[in-house]
């Protein structure tokens, strides 16, 4: 064995390649071993350093792959065990274990995260050369559960003839048997890039040391560090401990070698300054101007600005002659940056490769399998059928057809096998009695889904090969492959490559399932669960089509001298250094206790114990990753959390490397900021979209004027337009063309009292409801609208019944007649919940109707339609529920309400309570048209309710209870003062609601003023997002948050403030304000 080390300014790979060539030229077979994460890059680097740029005697690989070279044809043929097969086997094992066998983990049997933890523990134990019984655990019940699970897994592996040992363990067994002595005698193993071995790797090294021609292990250590006796906290602590342990174990002295090629002195000086800092020695080295040019620290506002500035600098470097493959981008937090790196690099036309496997779990193919399995498991649940259809892999239906089908399922609340097995018949009807859903088309989709799924789900328990064939036949019947191809072809080229990799993984999972379970008797439900679980656990990786791309990866996977230009992003205190804390089914404490019990060839790696020395070595590798220029960057805000610079960066700053504060990407850095056409266009768009935070210099203004003219010509040539973007709460005015069609000048504007209320509640709500015509989704389950319609119909029948029979009989008969109508049978007979609602409505109808006999009025008409015109500009349509007549001949209006509603003069003034005045105006106009002087007594609401009383409030059960009960069943609204004596004997609440004829006229005139003012604003076509507020602190109007993104605490300034007056001055004050407004005094305040 040879142990080599060299200074960081040298190329360790160059030194080790020279060693490899010497052995290869002497006839030995050389395996050049690199860590798993670096093997691809290392292979390219080794080839670049070979004298002839290639050699059949030198193989660059990993430990596991080297093992396969030797054992592929030497051992008994057994099935290889990959992660997906292991996942399916764990699912099968857990499925068969009962609650008595698993006391702790039984509830997690089907949990995907738990199964992944089991897979990770299985591989960790293989790497540690340990079994589950060897682990010291604090909770014995938990250990017993894990022993039960892994024992059952071992039996399954043996039964299915899987290789239970890892490839390294099989390799070691072959070495011990002597089968490989002849080959290993001419084999040299060169190991590069390691600062520690796992227990399994260390055991393999021990075996190879006895059989191989030579083992060469190299690492980076400075001559100064290697001479130190005390190395705790040293920058090279990890590699020093690594070599010294090997030196002691194998009684070999470490040798220092220097390479022919050395890298820039800037990085060497910086490394020696860091080394002196951590070994507490003195040095005369200082930071020169060359170092400041080669190593830069950038402080950024946030991660978006950080990536933007990096992209702009990359474009500049490309203009200086660098190629994409010369550039490496390192990320401090891959999860936080990967979603933003792609779009920004695409904007700047920077091809990149992020060497990170992507999970299949969010791909539509996995969603299809998940929905299919859930549909089988949960008996045709509505949500699963919808998701299955939306995956677009079951049938060739348009998006519109899928949306209509989903809308109908939600409306009719279709759930379960029985509901899907028969034709859908329930439907909605509009006012013209037109059907709301095209049931012919919807039933065609239902028939297609049901026929294929029902045929597929009929499968019984059978052999795995048969059940898989049945599944493949189902995919063939629904033309699954064509559907997948059709969806993929509509995607970008990159997404198509991802789809291809996903498809490969899917077919590989099906192949693994067949190989494992072809002779096993399984149910269809278990089969789908096993395939789905493997797909959810699967990862895929897209390989770039060209090598000339910018490499992007995590900074802790870098090695020294990787690329010419290196940009390290996200180097905050939180992520640099990283604090690794292992999570899983066993704790670090349990790992440590287990290690105390076993030797070095049987132990766990505990990352948390080695965090410090590993982080120092990672920082050293990062600071020497570039050969020309290194940019170290950190944002002040990351993931919406305020961050500060890494301690390592602060240390470099203390040496004299300045921190460059990169401000927000403005438009001043012209010569460096414009890298290509797309980035120029994006900045011009930003210039037009955002208000400038600073004045531009004359030179900058001239530049952007010229660029604007150029880009406008380019856009015009391509027939593209540049839409102007407003702030997130701003709305655009409707175009004149739309207004001319929607509101022709020669036609009056059609409004209703409810539309007027909606307009004053929030103008944008009026736009959505009455301009765009958006409606709430219908449901077969009745809501307040249906309840109100039902009660209206009952009262209509009661009032129309003029027979001389007991009033209670009239009510009962009216209820029965209403219940027989098709509309109400649809809503109130579909299920137990709707039938319960019907019983409550019947009680309300009986209670509310009980005041009809004691009301001293005559009903003149019901459900009377009217049309009212204001100055030929507004046409108001509506329906009056009931018109009553007193004994003196005066008439009034009754409007039924399913909720507590009163006439409030303050809300009326603010445009929120115009119904009763509108109805009074309509009745007044009707009477005038008959050439009769109108004689009105008022307009009122009747709250339809079944009053509940708290009997604890009464000492005696006497007439006061009945009096209190009927006090809640009263008419409330607007009453004429002159009719007071005729109303006194009825159930009318007249307190504070009596108006003189002059006051009533004032109300009606102001009501007309509200309609005309709204008409003028609506015809202007600009609808504001302005829900109303009563107190200036809370918003009462409909905010429509899901559409407008209105936030009360941020956007309160856009809310419409209602005018309020003190209670004592309320009536007189608002009547006075109405007169002033109609005279033009305060028109703009409403």
Curated annotation (Swiss-Prot):
EC category: hydrolase
Further facts: Despite having helicase-like domains, this subunit does not have helicase activity.
Keywords of the record: ATP-binding, DNA damage, DNA repair, DNA-binding, Exonuclease, Helicase, Hydrolase, Nuclease, Nucleotide-binding
InterPro entries according to UniProt: ADDB_N, DNA_helicase_suRexB, P-loop_NTPase, PDDEXK-like_dom_sf, PDDEXK_AddAB-type, Restrct_endonuc-II-like
Molecular-function annotations in GO: 5'-3' exonuclease activity; ATP binding; double-stranded DNA binding; helicase activity; hydrolase activity, acting on acid anhydrides
Chain's role: The heterodimer acts as both an ATP-dependent DNA helicase and an ATP-dependent, dual-direction single-stranded exonuclease. Recognizes the chi site generating a DNA molecule suitable for the initiation of homologous recombination. This subunit has 5' -> 3' nuclease activity but not helicase activity.
Keyword Secreted tagged: no
Necessary cofactors: Mg(2+)
Name listed for the protein in its UniProt record: ATP-dependent helicase/deoxyribonuclease subunit B
Cited HAMAP family: AddB_type2 (MF_01453)
GO BP: double-strand break repair via homologous recombination
Annotated family: Belongs to the helicase family. AddB/RexB type 2 subfamily.
Subunit-structure text: Heterodimer of AddA and RexB.
Keyword Acyltransferase: no
E.C. number: 3.1.-.-
């Amino acid at each position: 064995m040879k142990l080599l080390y060299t200074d960081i300014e040298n190329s360790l790979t160059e030194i080790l390649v020279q060693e490899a060539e010497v052995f290869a030229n002497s006839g030995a077979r050389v395996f050049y071993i690199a860590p798993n994460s670096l093997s691809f890059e290392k292979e390219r680097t080794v080839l670049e350093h070979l004298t002839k740029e290639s050699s059949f005697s030198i193989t660059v690989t990993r430990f596991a792959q080297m093992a396969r070279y030797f054992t592929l044809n030497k051992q008994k043929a057994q099935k290889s065990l990959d992660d997906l097969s292991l996942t399916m086997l764990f699912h099968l094992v857990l499925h068969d274990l009962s609650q008595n066998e698993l006391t702790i983990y039984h509830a997690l049997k089907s949990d995907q995260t738990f199964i992944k933890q089991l897979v990770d523990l299985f591989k960790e134990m293989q790497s540690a050369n340990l079994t589950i019984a060897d682990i010291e655990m604090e909770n014995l019940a938990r250990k017993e559960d894990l022993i039960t699970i892994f024992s059952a897994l071992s039996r399954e592996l043996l039964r299915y003839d899987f290789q239970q040992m890892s490839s390294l363990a099989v390799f070691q067994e072959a070495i011990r048997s002597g089968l490989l002595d002849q080959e290993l005698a001419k084999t040299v193993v060169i190991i590069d890039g390691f600062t520690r071995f796992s227990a399994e790797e260390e055991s393999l090294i021990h075996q190879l040391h006895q059989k191989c021609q030579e083992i060469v292990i190299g690492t980076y250590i400075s001559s100064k560090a290697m001479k130190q006796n005390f190395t705790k906290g040293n920058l090279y602590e990890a590699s020093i401990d690594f070599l010294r342990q090997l030196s002691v174990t194998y009684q070999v002295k470490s040798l220092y070698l220097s390479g022919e090629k050395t890298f820039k002195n800037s990085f060497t000086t910086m490394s020696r300054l860091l080394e002196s800092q951590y070994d507490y020695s003195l040095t005369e080295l200082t930071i020169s101007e060359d170092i400041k040019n080669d190593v830069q620290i950038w402080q950024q506002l946030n991660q978006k600005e950080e990536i933007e500035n990096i992209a702009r600098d990359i474009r500049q470097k490309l203009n200086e002659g660098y190629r994409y493959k010369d550039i490496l981008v390192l990320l401090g937090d891959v999860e936080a940056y990967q979603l933003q790196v792609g779009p920004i690099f695409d904007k700047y036309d920077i091809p990149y490769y992020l060497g990170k496997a992507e999970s299949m779990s969010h791909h539509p193919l996995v969603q299809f399998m998940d929905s299919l399995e859930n549909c089988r498991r949960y008996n045709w649940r509505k949500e699963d059928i919808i998701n299955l259809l939306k995956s677009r892999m079951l049938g060739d239906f348009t998006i519109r057809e899928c949306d209509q089908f989903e809308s109908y399922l939600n409306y009719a609340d279709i759930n379960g096998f029985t509901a899907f097995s028969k034709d859908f018949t329930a439907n909605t009807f509009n006012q013209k009695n037109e059907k709301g859903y095209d049931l012919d088309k919807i039933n065609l989709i239902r028939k297609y889904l049901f026929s294929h799924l029902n045929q597929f789900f009929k499968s019984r328990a059978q052999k795995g090969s048969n059940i898989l064939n049945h599944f493949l036949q189902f995919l063939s019947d629904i033309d699954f492959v064509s559907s997948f191809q059709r969806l993929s072809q509509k995607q970008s080229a990159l997404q198509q490559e991802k789809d291809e990799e996903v498809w490969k993984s899917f077919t590989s999972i099906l192949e693994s399932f067949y190989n494992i379970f072809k002779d096993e008797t399984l149910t269809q439900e278990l089969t789908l669960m096993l395939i789905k679980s493997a797909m959810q656990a699967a990862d895929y990786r897209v390989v770039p089509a060209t090598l000339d791309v910018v490499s992007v990866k995590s900074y802790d996977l870098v090695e020294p001298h990787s690329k010419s230009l290196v940009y390290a992003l996200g180097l905050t205190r939180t992520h640099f250094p990283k604090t690794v804390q292992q999570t899983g089914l066993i704790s670090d404490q349990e790992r440590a206790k287990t290690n105390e019990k076993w030797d070095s060839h049987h132990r766990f790696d505990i990352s948390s114990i080695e965090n410090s020395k590993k982080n120092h070595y990672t920082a050293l590798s990062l600071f020497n990753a570039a050969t020309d220029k290194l940019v170290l960057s950190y944002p002040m805000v990351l993931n919406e959390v305020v961050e500060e610079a890494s301690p390592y960066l602060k240390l470099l700053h203390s040496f004299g490397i300045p921190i460059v504060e990169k401000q927000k990407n403005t438009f001043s850095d012209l010569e460096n900021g414009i890298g290509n056409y797309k980035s120029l266009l994006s900045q011009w768009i930003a210039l037009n979209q955002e208000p400038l935070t600073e004045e531009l210099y004359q030179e900058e203004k001239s530049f952007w004027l010229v660029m604007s003219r150029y880009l406008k010509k380019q856009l015009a040539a391509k027939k593209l337009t540049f839409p102007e973007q407003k702030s997130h709460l701003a709305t655009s005015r409707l175009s004149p063309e739309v207004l001319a069609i929607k509101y022709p000048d020669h036609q009056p504007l059609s409004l209703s009292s409810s539309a007027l209320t909606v307009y004053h509640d929030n103008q944008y709500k009026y736009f959505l409801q009455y301009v765009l015509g958006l409606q709430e989704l219908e449901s077969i389950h009745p809501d307040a609208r249906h309840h109100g319609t039902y009660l209206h119909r009952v009262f209509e029948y009661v009032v129309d019944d003029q027979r001389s029979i007991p009033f209670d009989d009239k009510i009962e008969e009216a209820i029965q007649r209403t219940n027989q109508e098709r509309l109400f049978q649809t809503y109130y007979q579909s299920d137990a919940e709707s039938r319960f609602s019907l019983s409550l409505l019947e009680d309300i109808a009986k209670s509310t109707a009980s005041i009809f006999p004691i009301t001293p009025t005559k009903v003149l008409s019901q459900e009377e339609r009217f049309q009212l015109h204001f100055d030929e500009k507004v046409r108001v349509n509506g329906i009056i529920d009931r018109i009553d007549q007193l004994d003196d001949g005066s008439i009034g209006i009754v409007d039924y309400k399913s909720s507590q509603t009163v006439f409030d003069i303050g809300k009326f003034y603010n445009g929120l309570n115009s119904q009763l005045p509108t109805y009074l105006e309509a009745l007044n106009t009707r009477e005038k048209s008959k050439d009769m002087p109108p004689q009105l007594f008022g307009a009122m609401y009747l709250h339809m309710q079944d009053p509940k009383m708290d009997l604890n409030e009464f000492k005696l059960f006497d007439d006061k209870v009945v009096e209190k009960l009927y006090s809640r069943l009263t008419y409330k609204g607007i009453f004429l003062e002159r009719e007071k004596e005729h109303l006194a004997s009825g159930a009318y609440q007249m307190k504070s609601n009596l108006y003189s004829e002059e006051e009533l006229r004032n109300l009606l005139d102001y009501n007309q003023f509200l309609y005309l003012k709204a008409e003028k604003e609506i015809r202007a076509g600009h609808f504001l997002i302005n829900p109303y507020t009563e107190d200036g602190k809370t918003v009462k109007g409909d905010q429509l948050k899901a559409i407008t993104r209105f936030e009360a605490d941020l956007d309160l300034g856009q809310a419409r403030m209602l005018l309020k007056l003190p209670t004592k001055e309320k009536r007189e004050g608002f009547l006075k304000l109405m007169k002033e407004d109609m005279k033009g005094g305060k028109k703009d305040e409403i």
